[in-house]
Amino acid sequence: MPKYSQVFLKDAGMCRDIATALGPEEFGLGVEIGPGRGALTEFLYPLWGAKLAAVEIDPLMTARIKESFPGLRIINSDFLTLDLEAVFPSGTAAFIGNLPYECSTAILIKILAFSRLGAAVLMFQREVARKITAATGDPDYGYLSVAVQAQSEIALLADVPAASFSPVPEVDSSVLVFKPRKTLADAVLRERFLGFVKNAFSHRRKTLLNSLSMGLNMDKTEVEPLIKAAGFDPRLRPQNLSVEDYLKLSAVFERGAAGEKAL
């Protein structure tokens, strides 16, 4: 396994499908995350031209990409440490990439928080993709499902078998397409919502009342009236509430907390 745990996509047909999933004319710039050996870049660069930038953590791969694609803006950095607003200060951005398995969800959450996100086409381990797209009540439905679906519309582009990569990983992958929703445009509101949902799922085997009480460090006598005010049964499990339910419930808790501060 390479130093940075990369698995490189070698299926040219899949690279073409990913590269053409979005129309460059709809965006101010495209950002490829982790181009590696450049298999996907070969299809992206002719389409995006000067509008394409790439972020690569591996200095050796960075040098290789620079040599293979003269004129391409490539940033040798860990994507998770980049200040996206500063590095890409203008233009609606599309993010494309075969993400490292171990930090794919952190990268996704960072992308969804970008103020000028236009869309994203990203590769995940299939198990993670199932968690992202899981429906209410599904075994895979949890914090990640709500956090991502509250901020974006998601579509499955393709399932990708392990044999499409080098070295061959032990798991299959899936490519998802994300289009941002405007529900959590405010950064402070988004962080509060994500924190609220994380607390709700902190004890997913317990009732919503118990899980929120423990997660928020609030007495049940404070939590129960707020759950009921939102129109929900406190005995429900966290996985029984939909994304829209969580948006509604978190808003009620926000108003409840604001009311307490005003007293």
Identify what each model region corresponds to.
Residues 226-231, 237-244:
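Short linear loop/turn motifs
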Residues 171, 178, 188-230:
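Long, well-ordered amphipathic alpha-helical subdomains in the mid-to-C-terminal portions
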Residues 1-195, 221, 239, 243, ...:
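Catalytic cores of RNA-modifying enzymes
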